[in-house]
Amino acid sequence: MKTTAKLSFMMFVEWFIWGAWFVSLWLWLSKSGFSAGEIGWSYACTAIAAILSPILVGSITDRFFSAQKVLAVLMFAGALLMYFAAQQTTFAGFFPLLLAYSLTYMPTIALTNSIAFANVPDVERDFPRIRVMGTIGWIASGLACGFLPQMLGYADISPTNIPLLITAGSSALLGVFAFFLPDTPPKSTGKMDIKVMLGLDALILLRDKNFLVFFFCSFLFAMPLAFYYIFANGYLTEVGMKNATGWMTLGQFSEIFFMLALPFFTKRFGIKKVLLLGLVTAAIRYGFFIYGSADEYFTYALLFLGILLHGVSYDFYYVTAYIYVDKKAPVHMRTAAQGLITLCCQGFGSLLGYRLGGVMMEKMFAYPEPVNGLTFNWSGMWTFGAVMIAIIAVLFMIFFRESDNEITAIKVDDRDIALTQGEVK
């Protein structure tokens, strides 16, 4: 099997694993008698894990172990943890296992990115073609756990623990396949101490002004972006869209198209403009949701346009962000740098977004009594999200000054390395 095919299959299974359990988890937990608060904490596991684990694993991988071997170990551990989590019937038994599983899974996002980056000749050209298989994997997991069983005449498996068992099996599969991936050895031989283990050496990248602006804007953007994942399905259903869950997959299909088109856009317009376009389209998407409804053809079309813009905003910002980080990070800390952006976005940013969105919907946008069939002031919520993203876009446009021909790896000399390891007082 050619290297590109191996990397594509790796990315397919990586995102199939997450999609298999994440989308339908609330159905099984609610049917099993878990409270709304317990379900919320269960979904927060990935954000908590993204804070605790990726940089640690990235720093160890950068120094000691080949990335594909670390991937294999994490996948095997995750398979066991998810299998046992699927057997639980109480929150006290389920939550610790799901959190432990998430701690094994979230670092693999950065690991698979690093393995792909290290084994393609042209990152800007080749990575989007490989990463698009992750989106296809996510869609495939939805089909496997949603439509396919019913099409074959079986009962719906979404409200059961079967999607979790599928996740466990898929994790074991990728664990085995990882040993057949291209060897991606550690790039650094520096001293290992507690600061390096915690990934604090990657924080030295923040001394670069443009990288700091990028990092800060990525963190802020993750908060309003989380509103889409939490509320879009409920909003679309409440305003009258039938089978909203199915129609929302249009966002993933548009993601495939724009992922494949990403090399053209980055070459033609440059990384800064593509990142900015990702922010702008996210704000426009929420703008469509402000005025969307199922009452008229035009307002109904706005709902679909908002869904389709998800692919544009996600690809143009976050996929481009991973490419930018790979360009900026020195070779010996690229995995840790990918972990840093995962920590920033899927970790702190998403967790704060989930909490902010939930509190605002409960305290500010919930109607005491239904108004025109709506239980929430959805327009107010989407307006807040759109304005927040627009402000982030303006900040990014003003303060991020790096052009494509200036994007080079941040120089880290021996003194910098000594500082991160506590050898210079």
Functional labels for PLM-detected ranges:
Residues 1, 181-216, 416-422:
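Juxtamembrane intracellular "pre-TM" segments in multi-pass secondary transporters
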Residues 1-47, 210-249, 318:
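Helix-loop boundary and gating motifs at the non-cytosolic
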Residues 12, 81-82, 91-111, 115, ...:
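Hydrophobic core of transmembrane alpha-helices in multi-pass small-molecule transporters
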Residues 34-45, 125-133, 158-165, 237-256, ...:
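Loop-to-transmembrane helix entry
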Residues 52-66, 149-153, 258-271, 361:
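Helix-to-loop junctions at the C-terminal end of transmembrane segments
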Residues 69-83, 273-288:
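Structural signature of the two symmetry-related core transmembrane helices
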Residues 85-86, 171-182, 347, 376-417, ...:
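Multi-pass alpha-helical transporter architecture, strongest
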Residues 147-169, 359-389:
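A membrane-interface helix-boundary motif in multi-pass transporters
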